Amino acid sequence: MLKTLFGDPNARKLKKFQPFVTEVNLLEEEIQKLSDEELKYKTVEFREALDKARNDEELEDILDEILPEAFAVVREAGIRVLGMRHFDVQLLGGIVLHKGQIAEMKTGEGKTLVATLPAYLNGLTGKGVHVVTVNDYLARRDAEWMGQVHRFLGLSVGLIQGGMNPEERKKNYGCDITYTTNSELGFDYLRDNMATAMAEVVQRPFNYCIIDEVDSILIDEARTPLIISGQVERPTEKYLQAAAIAAQLLKQESEDDPGDYEVDEKARNVLMTDAGFEKAEQLLNVQDLYDQDNPWAHYIFNAIKAKELFTKDVNYMIRNNEIVIVDEFTGRVLPGRRWSDGLHQAIEAKEGVEIQRETQTLATITYQNFFLLYPKLSGMTGTAKTEETELEKVYNLQVTIIPTNRISRRYDLPDVVYKTEDAKWQAVAGEVEELHHQGRPILVGTTSVEKSEVLSKLLQQKKIHHNLLNARPENVERESEIVAQAGRKGAVTIATNMAGRGTDIILGGNADYMARLKIREYLMPQIVMPEDDDLMAGVSGNGGRRPQGFGTSKKKGKNWSPSDADIFPTKMSQETEEILKEAVKFAVEQYGQQSLTELEAEEKIAIASENAPTDDSVVEKLRVVYKAIRKTYETVTDQEHDEVVELGGLHVIGTERHESRRIDNQLRGRAGRQGDPGSTKFFLSLEDNLLRIFGGDRVAGLMNAFRVEEDMPIESQMLTRSLEGAQKKVETFYYDTRKQVFEYDEVMNNQRRAIYAERRRVLEGLDLKEQVLQYAEKTMDEIVDAYVNPELPPEEWDIPNLVGKVKEFVYLLKDVTPQDMEDMTVSEMKIFLHEEVRKAYDIKEYEVDQIRPGLMREAERFFILQQIDTLWREHLQTMDALRESIGLRGYGQQDPLIEYKQEGYEMFLEMMIDIRRNVVYSLFQFQPQGQPQTV
């Protein structure tokens, strides 16, 4: 109703941006006539225009003025370098991103190409643009692929990958446009704020950021804070004992059942009953689980959580005798990440693997607060409209839906629901068998490694050849190979949580990728250094995904052939094979036998498969071969493409509704890309987690009401409504959790900003003497206020103890006596001590600088940073403890958040006072050795 009255707000926004698009189109012909040199010179002209800006506001105005011409230049560069022309809808997406909004674009609409427009425009300012993706592989792919456009136009392109050293990071962050992942970016920020010298700081001040898969980073990952931690000693036997006790405690199955503990699956928490406490205390032979000298409660709670809420092959996997976390949203393993607060150790104890040391938080920030540090933020995703309210409230980001370039021909079939999970899997296998015989490609999405293997076994029994894509290492290695052929005729692919996978499924198969793979097979063994294989192990990052044409690390001696020889649609002709061997031989002559790193070799293949101008003769030869191989393969894939389209395109099967409708939509979005036909269907059961946890009693009632056979699907409007209701409930529940995390973290965030700003001032400050003197004067004032009450008569003032305390802090004031201060007022005392402490500091400085000139300046910086870091670490722990206990205030009719803000603020002020006092004390106590020493 409102839409018809006021018009669609989304359409209004698009209408406002349309004139820009028209202008870009009008400039196209003129820009086409420019030579490569003239096109590149446009960058210089734009930069000269931007140099005239006197402030940030003027800079934004000039960017808006040059936008149409800059976009027209990027569009032309895209055609010349990549052979890709930005559609009008992609230009619209670029404008939305430049305006600091979220562009919602469907899968297959070329989001990666869209980002080149605002990245180039904002990169012209020289202040740095960060393009953020969800993993190392996508960052590398985009930097090498899209980066060619920027490099061609004269902008520098940087790439941040796991395993890079600080020098490389600094150099790459210094570029005009830097491609990176959200976690690398966040951890570099935290590390920069732990640096002990400016030379160690790798990032510049933040300017503009474009987040790919923005919903996955700002919403799915918002609940998980980034944490840098140091190790602390904790007794491992306590974890083992707690695991043994948790195994003996019984879960409460119903209200009347006594049980030892309740499990709240919704809040992912456990609550022990009185009987449980008693039983645990008896088994441990202790009086009280909360005894301060020998606390057990924390260990027991974690052990029960590990037993009830964390399932092997769903939440984690065991790899090389270690517990590795599986990301619940992407189905990928997260090597190196650990659950905090002793939970990881509890799971290690449960599974009987080696228990690693517990950690203490040194620095932490949530993605929510991290990305709010950017003055201008934007993002792209296929699905954001469902979370629009949250994106607007928390991040102040508007969502604009960009129309698709071609009309979608995807057909979403109604859900079918089975009574039991077994019946559901049988039905899925039946559907796959039927469509597979017709020759349609099928993609089945599952929610965990375990479930994908259940289906895989059923298909093996039916003798249906299929590919499995989940977090197991042997499958991760082949990810891009599997996706490249997922659209071929009759292909069956089972994928775990395929959200944000970055590689499109092309009907008929991806000839382009297969041609690159063929070149890799011949070229890599000849030109890649064998010893690089180990070095690269750290670089592949998140789960070692293999990108399109950019490989991951190899174990020594592993061959470069694809793991599935049938991947190639047809054999190469003898003639093509000869040219390929010639090109490889030529590459060896030019570069030397096994002389390149794997990354360098991958980059050569990547450039060979694009149209970027190159002066490398090897790349030119490889390009000729690449085109020949691709042409051979296309004779098969093009024909298959037409056959598959005729059959109805890719069929996507969902096997469980995800907690978030958005992830379901991402899976559906794999079918019907760029106007191709396709269909989707969800198979569910009344035993699925979502229905079990959030569907509640209504569904249980329905189960009994439907007296149907196990293998009969239930189709009912009421059930579909229950499902959507359950999903909305979950989304609201998680939104509230995130909002709460955000509100509480906001308190920490203000404190973090203050402490990091102080720290940065110290790092950059050339002369910290004045700062230390102010610390000293404030400390003197505090001592006076502590011992002198102006409301009492002067004869009752405790001046002897006041003087004693002053000498305790500053031994150089040993000559000050109570008599010196007898007849002074409070303010006179303070002025007197200010003068004395300044004199004492000059003496101290003279003594220290006798050892080595300038040593006092170094000591000042060292002690201030040391105190900030040590006390901030302790403060993080006390704030954590406060946060955990504050929830109970709700029972006392107080608002826990207000209490947390109040007490947190008081604790922060105390910490700042402690930092000041400790610095003053440490500097006056500082006794450098006779030898020159570095502090």
From Swiss-Prot:
GO terms assigned for molecular function: ATP binding; protein-exporting ATPase activity
Pfam families (UniProt xref): P-loop_SecA, SecA_DEAD, SecA_PP_bind, SecA_SW
Annotated keywords: ATP-binding, Cell inner membrane, Cell membrane, Cytoplasm, Membrane, Nucleotide-binding, Protein transport, Thylakoid, Translocase, Translocation, Transport
Domain of life: Bacteria
Any single biological process term in GO: protein transport by the Sec complex
InterPro entries noted in UniProt: Helicase_ATP-bd (IPR014001), Helicase_C-like (IPR001650), P-loop_NTPase (IPR027417), SecA (IPR000185), SecA_CS (IPR020937), SecA_DEAD (IPR011115), SecA_motor_DEAD (IPR014018), SecA_preprotein_X-link_dom (IPR011130)
EC nos: 7.4.2.8
UniProt-listed SMART domains: SecA_DEAD, SecA_PP_bind
Keyword Protein transport (UniProt): yes
Main location: membrane
Binding annotation for ATP: Q90, G108, E109, G110, K111, T112, D504
Family: Belongs to the SecA family.
Binding partners and assembly: Monomer and homodimer. Part of the essential Sec protein translocation apparatus which comprises SecA, SecYEG and auxiliary proteins SecDF. Other proteins may also be involved.
Protein name: Protein translocase subunit SecA
Gene name as annotated: secA
